A protein has these predicted regions:
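Carbohydrate-active catalytic/glycan-binding domains of CAZyme proteins
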Residues: 1-287
Length: 287
């Protein structure tokens, strides 16, 4: 419990306080191994990072290593995209963060990167905080840098959106770009479809177009992975057998002047008695 909005001074470090990432690995999508990593402990030069978040995983074919790319900023400076390499066991960072992409305008942040390889090109979709936040694309011949800026907006949203992610339709040369429309209530996802990463068709939002939600609402910062039929069946069978019930509780923190139910207090100070007097309203029920 703390009395300040953030753990560190907001003017100096901005919102958030996340200095690392959680790495998790599984062979069956049920049992997971976890490792915590801290960027600020890798070197003294990273001790003053403001926040690190929105990680994604890719494989760098040129160096033969798993690569994590993510959003990070130093202190309360603008946000940029960085990458690191991790070991084969996926429990330890093996390199210092390197710059993956920064917005050409030095006053604008770039966050929430998502990379898709098509042919010999790497397509980086990201959020540009250039006016109203939205989705832009940059393309490179290599996964770890040299992305060429494209000024075009690739979302169809009149509202702010973030967290782009791309997946390929099975059996088709079509890709779907999904993004989080966080600026509406309740939150929703919106979708576009492309076959060439130049022209995009607007598919609308969940339940407002061809995409339908099932057992969820108000989704947030999502991602999509392909499953085989066997994998999907195993997951369904496991969770039908191992249903979980979550019960949340909240601690009640009070600092009452006196017990009972009172409201609308007025406090007066008496010069004659040199005491303070409280005059509240009451429901008439003691205790």
């Amino acid at each position: 419990y703390r009395e300040t909005e953030w753990e560190r001074d907001r003017n100096m470090y901005g919102w958030g306080n996340n200095k690392g990432l959680v790495l998790m690995k599984s062979w069956d999508l049920v049992n997971w191994k976890r490792a915590n990593t801290r960027f600020d402990q890798l070197t003294a030069g990273l001790s003053e990072i403001g926040c690190a978040w929105a990680p994604e995983i890719a494989y760098d074919e040129r160096v033969g290593k798993l690569m994590i790319y993510y959003t990070m900023r130093f202190r309360n400076e603008r946000n940029k995209l960085y990458y690191v390499y991790v070991n084969d066991d996926f429990d330890r960072i093996e390199s210092l963060p390197q710059l993956l992409y920064e917005y050409p305008d030095e006053t604008v942040s770039a966050i929430d990167g998502d990379i898709t390889k098509v042919g010999d090109k790497y397509h980086l979709f990201y959020v540009a905080h250039d006016g109203q936040p939205g989705i832009k694309q940059a393309v490179s011949d290599r996964i770890s840098g040299d992305y060429e800026y494209d000024p075009r907006w690739y979302d169809f949203e009149p509202k702010s959106c973030e967290a782009p992610t791309v997946w390929k339709r099975l059996g088709e040369d079509k890709w779907v770009l999904m993004y989080d429309v966080y600026s509406i209530t309740p939150h929703n996802f919106a979708f576009t479809e492309t076959s060439d990463f130049i022209t995009f068709k607007n598919l609308g939002r969940f339940n407002e177009g061809v995409m339908k939600s099932t057992n969820f609402n108000a989704p947030k910062h999502g991602a999509v992975v392909h499953l085989t039929t066997e994998e999907a069946d195993k997951l369904e069978a496991y969770w039908l057998k191992n249903k979980r019930k979550y019960v949340s509780t909240a601690s009640i923190q009070r600092n009452p002047l006196f017990p009972g139910y009172y409201a609308d207090p007025e406090i007066l100070y008496s010069e004659q008695t040199q005491k303070y007097y409280v005059y509240p309203t009451t429901d008439g029920i003691p205790g």
